[in-house]
Amino acid sequence: MSLAIAVFAVIIGLVIGYVSISAKMKSSQEAAELMLLNAEQEATNLRGQAEREADLLVNEAKRESKSLKKEALLEAKEEARKYREEVDAEFKSERQELKQIESRLTERATSLDRKDDNLTSKEQTLEQKEQSISDRAKNLDAREEQLEEVERQKEAELERIGALSQAEARDIILAQTEENLTREIASRIREAEQEVKERSDKMAKDILVQAMQRIAGEYVAESTNSTVHLPDDTMKGRIIGREGRNIRTFESLTGVDVIIDDTPEVVTLSGFDPIRREIARMTMEMLLKDGRIHPARIEELVEKNRQEIDNKIREYGEAAAYEIGAPNLHPDLMKIMGRLQFRTSYGQNVLRHSIEVAKLAGIMASELGENAALARRAGFLHDIGKAIDHEVEGSHVEIGMELARKYKEPPVVVNTIASHHGDVEAESVIAVIVAAADALSAARPGARSESLESYIKRLHDLEEIANGFEGVQTSFALQAGREIRIMVNPGKIKDDKVTILAHKVRKKIENNLDYPGNIKVTVIRELRAVDYAK
């Protein structure tokens, strides 16, 4: 009984446990299903959010892609535009170059046509001359036959009359024939000489005309004054300085006369030496720009500009040598030639004159079949002696010959320099050509001025007289030659000798120069003591 009860109790417990477990399992299943639903909902939400974010990213990427594409397109267009501009510029440059080449070819073709025409004309002239000579030869042959016939007739006549022997008759006839032929030949020689002279004169004129037409001569009249513009008239007082110290220092150091008058905002620098005048002009302009105008600054700038002018002289010479096609000229000769930029001959700039002579000589030499490069070189150097003739004794021809020999120029160049004024005989065609080119350049209307050259020579002679006295360091002709200012060596000339020197200079000027009015002689003795504090 109790066992049954126990078994029943166990069964009841099992049933209850099963029911309890079933209820729990059902509850857990419902919870699981709920969680599954929640998870699915969350997944759906996350997927929607992800899809939205993905859409946003896609849209953003599309916008960025469009922006990048637009920028790339703009950059490509800009690159294309730049490339097109470069191509256009290159094409334009090439087209311009082609035009220049075409122009040069056209000019060369025209020149060749002219030469061809000249050669054709000369050939025709020679053919005519040859025909004329042939005709004359035939005439002479016919005349000779006639003379022989006359001889035979005379011989027969003489033999007929029997007064003379055959040998004597022959001698008489030969003498008469020789006399007749001599007159005929002399007449024909004179005619031929006259014809050759006329033709040679015409050819020479043609060559000179061609040379003159191909030279674009330029000429700027040389002056003895340079004008410097001032910012205002108050600068005139500063230029003069206290008690005239600045202007006296400026004139003493540069050798140029400073003219300050009523002309507004202008100072005039007057001097016959172009190098001194250029140094003075540069110094004055630098003083005005700098604003510091006092004797020490003036001295500093004058020395600086002297060095600058020396560099300019070399540049002028090199540029001129390259212009006439002589770049292999010795550097020292180039520098000496550069000094001619600041020299004049009868008012004509000597460097420009030398370049013009070189070009004319080259053209004429080319027309005559001579060495054009050598002719240009000889023409360029023919007046080189004028660059230093005021420093070295002798004429500019002698000095030029010495320079040419010193720097081993060809003998043709040396002889050209020596003979271009007819001092010695020309030994080559080039020497004659250069002499003709020199005369042609000098004779060109407006190229030279006798009055200016005479004035400059008078000032130069005035300075030479002063420099000839012992103890004189340098001298400057000022006031258009109305004053000579002499700087003496204080170690050689004492104070009591200054007045005597001025008197001697005055007497020599009176005895050796012709001049209008009076000339003031000023002798300056300046003693400087310089030391340095350390």
From Swiss-Prot:
Residues 350-443 form the HD domain. The keyword Iron does not apply. Residues 224-287 form the KH domain. Gene3D superfamilies: Hypothetical protein af1432, K Homology domain, type 1. GO terms for cellular component: plasma membrane. Disulfide bonds: none annotated. One of its GO terms (molecular function) is RNA binding. It comes from the Bacteria. Keywords: Cell membrane, Endonuclease, Hydrolase, Membrane, Nuclease, RNA-binding, Transmembrane, Transmembrane helix. The keyword Acyltransferase does not apply. Signal peptide: none annotated. It is a single-pass membrane protein. Residues 109-141 are annotated as: Disordered. CDD domains: HDc (cd00077), KH-I_RNaseY (cd22431). InterPro entries: HD/PDEase_dom (IPR003607), HD_domain (IPR006674), HDIG_dom (IPR006675), KH_dom (IPR004087), KH_dom_type_1 (IPR004088), KH_dom_type_1_sf (IPR036612), Ribonuclease_Y (IPR017705), RNase_Y_N (IPR022711). The chain crosses the membrane at residues 1-21. It is found in: Cell membrane. It holds the Pfam family HD. GO terms for biological process: mRNA catabolic process. Its main location: membrane. Belongs to the RNase Y family. Endoribonuclease that initiates mRNA decay. HAMAP family: RNase_Y. This is Ribonuclease Y. It comes from Streptococcus pneumoniae serotype 4 (strain ATCC BAA-334 / TIGR4).
